[in-house]
Every structure is written in structure tokens, then in C-alpha cells.
Amino acid sequence: MGNLVIGSRGSELALWQANHIKERLKKECLIESEIQIVKTKGDKILDTPLNKIGGKGLFTKELEELLLKGTIDLAVHSLKDVPVVFEKGLDLACITKRADVRDTFLSVKFPDLMSLPKGAKVGTTSLRRSMQLKLKRQDLDTESLRGNVQTRLKKLECGEFDAIILAEAGLCRLEIQGAKYRKAFSVKEMIPSMGQGALGVEMLKNHKHFATLQKLNDEKSAFCCRLEREFIKGLNGGCQIPIGVHASLMGDRVKIQAVLGLPNGKEVITKEKRGDKTKAFDLVQELLEEFLQSGAKEILEKAQLF
């Protein structure tokens, strides 16, 4: 039998992730594999903010099409990019152990967010980050920052931005210091995206190795990520809208924190729930109900106009 084919985007970070799964497949499942690079819509359109491109699955759709055709056997994604509703026949075979979930401030001149001058230009790909930055500093000029990690850092170093915000996990995976000043926000300061820090391996549910890939699943991370995805699903949300949600486990207790609002930070809902792990999905439903009662749907409709 030939090697399994792993579909991956072509960025340095995406290939690190694909190679990480390739190595684990060989070591833990005794399966040989090879990587096929696939360009997605989100990779091709680099001159437009992600929220303006439209549609869900900007970094996953082309990979899913190849899975359905049988051209590739599995697709490795940053879990935060994976839509919460799958194409028929597809699902996540595993969710890997989470890396650092935090967002990180990077700057050449300024040590932290509060030291930025009034009206400073901050680059981010994410409306979620923009919203939470504006909550802290309404004066900031948050602008779209596209490209891979190295491209974004070059834009910072060239003076296009006073600071940029990146995912800590990506910096750690690529072993990048990033800039003179680097400071991670706590989860309380900036609630991450659903699934941030974890990888999701997507396959056909009837693939003969689907069950085998579950050996790579991290139970604790998968549990928390599925809670986050359930919350997003309840709001009919995706990864390009201003919602942050983070679930964490401490023994038999679970905490779910969420934030949702306009990208300008002017209408924002922030809530959290704590409870027993056995009631975790009930807690998600309670949290959803509170968000909906607080006007979440209306805020998300307004957010589409930004």
C-alpha cells in the first residue's frame, strides 16, 4: 500500500504542522505519509481583510474538496480555522494537545500595549483581536495585517506598524523571537479564538485509518475545543467574526469564558461560566442563552458591516 497523503497549506507554519503530524503518524501509528501542498482561497487573496473576502472555510475548503475526491487522505489544519459544520462525510479524526493559547503583542519600539502612543497603528488579521484591543485602547488604529508569520514580522520591522498581534503558538512552533518587545496577553486580557493552539486532522469518516488517527487525539484538549466549537456553532459563527471563547479544565471543574462584540469595541458582551465537567455542554447552552438574551445576534449582524 502507498503512503497516506497529507494535505497542507504551503506556509512555513502550516508545513511545520503537517510535518508534526507526519512524524507522529510514523512513530505512534507506524504509518508512512507524504505531504501535498494545497493553495486555499485565503492564501490566494492577500490584499483584502479576511472578513471582507466572504464565505466560511477560507483556509480549509480546497483541502476538504480534495478529501472528498480521495486525492488526499487527511488534512492538517489550525483548529481555529476549521468551520464548525463539516461537509457531508467529513469530520475531525483527532484534535492534538494544545500549545500556548495566548495572543502576543510584538513591537520594535514599545514594550507593551499601554506604552503605545495615542493613535498607534496595530496590525492584526483578526476582528476578535481588534475588538479586544479597542476595549483597552479606543484610540488605537487597528488595521488588517495579512501574510505568513515572517511577512507580518517584516512589516513590523519596516515600520509599517507600531505593533502587531500574533498567536503565541505559531511563534513557539517556528522558534521565532519575533521582535525586540514580545509580551503575551493573559487569557483574561484577550480571550482566544475557538481551538486556538490546537491542530485538527480532518478525514473522511469512512476512511479505513479514521479510527487509527484517534491515537493522536489529546482527550483534555479535544474536550475543551469541542466546548468552544459548540458555543460558536450555537451563534452560527465562524473564524472571521469577532468572537473569542476559551474553555479550560481544572480537575473535574470547567471554566468557559467568551467575548463577542463589534470590531470597534463599542458594543461588547463578556461572560463566563464555571461548573462540573459532567455538565460542561449544559454550561455552554446556558452561556449561549445569556449571550442571545444580551443581544448577541444583533451585534453580530452589525459586525458584518465592518
Swiss-Prot record:
Protein name: Porphobilinogen deaminase
Gene name linked to the record: hemC
Matches recorded under InterPro entries: HemC, Porphobilin_deaminase_cofac_BS, Porphobilin_deaminase_N, Porphobilinogen_deaminase_C, Porphobilinogen_deaminase_C_sf
EC number: 2.5.1.61
Keyword ATP-binding tagged: no
Gene3D superfamilies in the cross-refs: Periplasmic binding protein-like II (3.40.190.10), Porphobilinogen deaminase, C-terminal domain (3.30.160.40)
Native source organism of the sequence: Helicobacter pylori (strain P12)
Modification type S-(dipyrrolylmethanemethyl)cysteine: residues: C239
GO annotation, cellular component aspect: cytoplasm
Cofactor(s), by name: dipyrromethane
Job description of the protein: Tetrapolymerization of the monopyrrole PBG into the hydroxymethylbilane pre-uroporphyrinogen in several discrete steps.
Pfam family, one: Porphobil_deam
